[in-house]
A protein has these predicted regions:
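Alpha-helical transmembrane segments and their immediate juxtamembrane cytosolic regions
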Residues: 1-289
């Protein structure tokens, strides 16, 4: 995502990025606020409420659209941070990344020590607030792509190790809390995949390191095509997810260990096919990006 292209100003960047993501985003906000009435998933009162709040937040049945807001925020901030990223040395970026990594430990630290580093009910902007959040991922990715001098073998094995540690940590954080018969709130039990937690950073960085070992002059055609369709797939996949979950879990009553991969694969394929069909329609960029 960053830094901006040489010679591109802030307004050109905004126009290019937001013209791609905002129209489809708004269209799917309307669709998630209305279409579920057809199969009885929401009533008219909920639909009206969701439509009236489109400018404030995502609809009731479109929880996955939460990520659009951090993405929009990143796009807004990239022109501001780009001059620093373009000129920052490896050491300067490492300093930022270290503080970012410490900030990703704070959800766990809060469990043990309570409020820390200026946190209180009248101040959420703790000491590391400006080094926290998804901007850290952007700087980390730039550092790996530009400054990291590891060999291909070191990236492969190091990335694999980080992936394994991050994945095991995430899995363990759930299983050590999910006690049968004990009711826990969702934010408590889902701390392990709160995205800006250290284990998710390890898993993400490891994956990026492994991908960086792929040496090819250009991506295969099917990868490029899928990449172009990925935004539309993301926007619509919850429609398909509900359908396949109902089929595999309720109608066929498959065990969870079988149902989850079946739901995932079918949702992915359905979203891919539907997005591809829509892409053939003139003006489809306003719907799927």
């Amino acid at each position: 995502l960053g830094p901006m292209k040489e010679g591109q100003n802030m307004w050109q960047f905004y126009r290019h990025r937001f013209m791609r993501i905002l129209p489809p985003f708004l269209i799917f906000m309307v669709l998630y606020s209305t279409l579920p009435m057809l199969w009885g998933q929401i009533d008219s009162a909920t639909s009206v409420k969701d439509l009236s709040r489109i400018w404030l937040n995502f609809p009731t049945l479109a929880g996955h659209l939460w990520f659009m807001y951090p993405l929009i925020s990143l796009y807004l901030f990239i022109p501001i941070v780009s001059p620093w990223i373009s000129k920052a040395s490896a050491k300067e970026e490492r300093f930022f990344i270290v503080l970012f990594l410490v900030s990703t430990c704070m959800p766990y630290l809060n469990r043990v020590a309570g409020e820390v580093w200026g946190q209180c009910f009248w101040n959420e902007y703790h000491m590391l607030w400006y080094f926290s959040g998804y901007l850290g991922y952007l700087v980390l990715a730039h550092y790996i792509r530009v400054h990291l001098t590891w060999s291909r073998s070191k990236r492969l094995w190091g990335g694999g190790l980080l992936m394994v540690i991050g994945a095991l940590w995430t899995i363990y954080s759930f299983y050590c809390q999910a006690v049968p018969g004990e009711i826990l709130s969702t934010p408590v039990i889902e701390i392990g995949w709160a995205f800006c937690t250290i284990n998710c950073v390890l898993l993400t960085a490891g994956t990026f390191l492994i991908f960086s070992t792929i040496k090819a002059p250009s991506a295969p055609r099917w990868v490029t095509e899928m990449s172009k369709l990925s935004y539309g797939m993301y926007l619509m996949h919850i429609f398909w997810l509900g359908l396949w979950a109902a089929l595999f879990k309720h109608n066929l009553a498959l065990p969870t260990v079988m149902a989850i991969p079946c739901i995932a694969v079918c949702t992915f394929i359905s979203s891919l096919i539907a997005t591809k069909i829509i892409s053939l329609i003139p003006g489809s960029k306003w719907v799927i990006g």
